[in-house]
């Protein structure tokens, strides 16, 4: 009589568990929270003076750059750019529906 063959269970669709015992449950990661910026919505005299003296010296002037450097909100930065353009201290390079790019006004004489 031939020796008995070990019965191999048919392959199942479920993956085999590696290791025995209970596995640790995966913990939910706590979502990252952005730090809230406390930007000004109105100019005070010190910030306005800083805008008038420093902004015309920037090579690239956009609302986001003014907002970041002067701690003012975006709508105030757009108004400040408009004010600087009226005074002639900066000039427009390009405009887009969502962004305006300006630079310092240089004399071409």
From Swiss-Prot:
The gene is RPS25A. This is Small ribosomal subunit protein eS25z. Belongs to the eukaryotic ribosomal protein eS25 family. GO terms for molecular function: structural constituent of ribosome. Residues 1-36 are annotated as: Disordered. Keywords: Ribonucleoprotein, Ribosomal protein. GO terms for cellular component: cytosolic small ribosomal subunit. The lineage of its organism: Eukaryota, Viridiplantae, Streptophyta, Embryophyta, Tracheophyta. It holds the Pfam family Ribosomal_S25. Residues 22-31 have a biased composition (Basic residues).
